[in-house]
């Protein structure tokens, strides 16, 4: 999420792609207003790592497939990517596996952030356990006001160090129509492939990108973008899994 123009420039350069003014993907990891947790409470959560450092989150779809955000996989090769799963800590524990291939949504647009979703195929299958479990994709978008949870790793305040332990925050779903209304500040930037979530003083932020927004025990969103971190009247924006479900199912079988 956007903090300042300097941050916008830095992330734009790192991504190697155009980023619209005021809009920044969540690349560096922050759960604002959240608390520490363990992987057994969020066993679908993974850490997507570039060259040994946490880069983005993701969700276990099945033993070989991870769902994440397309903006997490721009200008990168599989040779520098690994996935750590089954650990509460991004930098230790669990099992680390290489990435064999990935596929971004063909309609992903880094300027508008539409269709910000991707699938990753791992080089070896996961063994399911109490700390590694797949999460089902929702078949319908949750109702406006429904309870939801987002999880991830990262700093909890601007300029802070990255905590090693997984964190989560409870939010409320803001439906697409409501998120685009005058109640909030986005207007026409909210597209059919997006859903929002918001609670005053709580949010996902840079680096939680690609991570899971869960409601009713199902994956309903993928952390995508927003203005600021827990800024008033600016919900976090997520790829809408209900709207993109058909693509995910197809891509998972062909990546």
Swiss-Prot record:
Catalytic activity: Preferential cleavage: Arg-|-Xaa, Lys-|-Xaa
Site (Required for specificity): 203
CDD domains xrefs: Tryp_SPc (cd00190)
The family this protein is said to belong to: Belongs to the peptidase S1 family.
Entry's localization field: Secreted, Extracellular space
Disulfide bonds: 56-72, 179-196, 205-229
Signal peptide: 1-16
SUPFAM superfamilies xref list: Trypsin-like serine proteases
A molecular function GO annotation: serine-type endopeptidase activity
Major localization class: secreted
EC number: 3.4.21.4
Keyword line: Disulfide bond, Hydrolase, Protease, Secreted, Serine protease, Signal, Zymogen
Cleaved propeptide residues: 17-30
Peptidase S1 domain ranges (all copies): 31-253
Lineage: Eukaryota, Metazoa, Ecdysozoa, Arthropoda, Hexapoda
Protein name per the record: Trypsin alpha-4
Swiss-Prot/TrEMBL GO biological process terms: proteolysis
Active site, renumbered: 71 (charge relay system), 116 (charge relay system), 209 (charge relay system)
Family matches, as SMART domains: Tryp_SPc (SM00020)
Keyword set includes Disulfide bond: yes
GO cellular component: extracellular region
